[in-house]
């Protein structure tokens, strides 16, 4: 990608975030085009893509035959097919899996590094973008297209926008916003996704979890009414037989080091500590607070105390902006 990422700054929690323009270089774009695009994706992901409108985007999972997620995909209609955004670390293996049956269909599946991914969030983000685009997405219309640009709207943790565009428009946006917006890199968007409870699947956790272990059902990313797709039997069994005992949690507190994706944490049990969970992502905020996204048992006590392994500091559970009650 020729567009140069912005230098990193310590991320800020959404409640205190000034207007910020971010380069999302830790995320990557991919597309499927061709006459069979919809049918093909319908047989591969957990969401009902046939019901997706032009002005919708959603988080779906692409699973293996055992129902474990290769990746999750932020999916939207693009041209005569679909585009999706996923973590860059999983894009290549995910596309390899997705292409396995493509020889039998009229589809072309490819990475897209021509377009640039930008995020806009923070204080008066809508007002800042309103001067640059004739229409902005909203709760009622979550995807808006204008020329070479697609804008995606997110409600949580506070209103923000993801922009998929060409290099020329990305440069124009940077020039126009440079004076009033702080510039930051992917870590700020990652911090917002952790706060929003959007599961982050990097390479370390690819092929490890069924979608429900990362709350995908609560985020509208699983259809239990659609036809067959890879891994469907296991995903359905987890729902109808209560086989899923895990959930995605948000922890906050202090830690002397950031836990890495795939690492476990420790849970306080009386005077002792017991290993628990799998970290999906973690970020240290500019106020020193550490936020951690972790998959653990779904019956954790709300006042449980955790720590990064052998650390002197502790982490506690924070509420997510959505309910897990079905």
Swiss-Prot record:
GO biological process: iron-sulfur cluster assembly; RNA modification; tRNA processing
Disulphide connectivity of cysteines: none
CC per GO annotation: cytosol
Binding site for folate: 27, 189
Domain of life: Bacteria
GO terms for MF: folic acid binding
Cell location: Cytoplasm
Listed SUPFAM superfamilies: Aminomethyltransferase beta-barrel domain (SSF101790), Folate-binding domain (SSF103025)
Pfam families according to UniProt: GCV_T (PF01571), YgfZ_barrel (PF21130)
Keyword Metal-binding: no
InterPro entries, A to Z: GCV_T_N, GcvT/YgfZ_C, tRNA-modifying_YgfZ, YgfZ/GcvT, YgfZ/GcvT_CS, YgfZ_barrel
UniProt KW keywords: Cytoplasm, Folate-binding, tRNA processing
Family matches, as HAMAP family: tRNA_modifying_YgfZ (MF_01175)
Biological function: Folate-binding protein involved in regulating the level of ATP-DnaA and in the modification of some tRNAs. It is probably a key factor in regulatory networks that act via tRNA modification, such as initiation of chromosomal replication.
Family per record: Belongs to the tRNA-modifying YgfZ family.
Protein name per Swiss-Prot or TrEMBL: tRNA-modifying protein YgfZ
């Amino acid at each position: 990608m020729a567009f140069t990422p912005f230098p990193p700054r310590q991320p800020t929690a959404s409640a205190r975030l000034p207007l910020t323009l971010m380069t999302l270089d830790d995320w990557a774009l991919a597309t499927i085009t061709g006459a069979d695009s919809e049918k093909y994706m319908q047989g591969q992901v957990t969401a009902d893509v046939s019901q997706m409108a032009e002005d919708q985007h959603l988080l779906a999972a692409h699973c293996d035959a055992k129902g474990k997620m290769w990746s999750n995909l932020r999916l939207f209609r693009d041209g005569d097919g679909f585009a999706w955004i996923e973590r860059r670390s999983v894009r290549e293996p995910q596309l390899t899996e997705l292409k396995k049956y493509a020889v039998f269909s009229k589809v072309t599946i490819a990475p897209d590094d021509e377009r640039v991914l930008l995020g806009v969030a923070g204080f008066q983000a809508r007002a800042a973008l309103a001067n640059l685009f004739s229409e902005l997405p909203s709760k009622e219309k979550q995807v808006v297209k204008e020329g070479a640009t697609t804008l995606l709207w997110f409600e949580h943790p506070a209103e923000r926008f993801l922009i998929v565009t060409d290099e020329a428009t990305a440069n124009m946006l940077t020039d126009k916003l440079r004076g009033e917006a702080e510039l930051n890199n992917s870590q700020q968007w990652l911090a917002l996704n952790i706060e929003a409870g959007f599961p982050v699947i990097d390479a370390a956790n690819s092929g490890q979890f069924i979608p429900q272990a990362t709350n995908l059902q609560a985020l509208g990313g699983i259809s239990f009414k659609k036809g067959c797709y890879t891994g469907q039997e296991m995903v359905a069994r987890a729902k109808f037989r209560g086989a899923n005992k895990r959930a995605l949690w948000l922890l906050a507190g202090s830690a002397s080091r950031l836990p890495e994706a795939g690492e476990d944490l420790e849970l306080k049990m009386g005077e002792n500590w017991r290993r628990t969970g799998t970290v999906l992502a973690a970020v240290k905020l500019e106020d020193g607070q550490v936020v951690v996204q972790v998959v653990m048992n779904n019956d954790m006590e709300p006042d449980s105390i955790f720590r990064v392994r052998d650390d002197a500091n502790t982490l506690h559970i924070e509420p997510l902006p959505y309910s897990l009650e079905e």
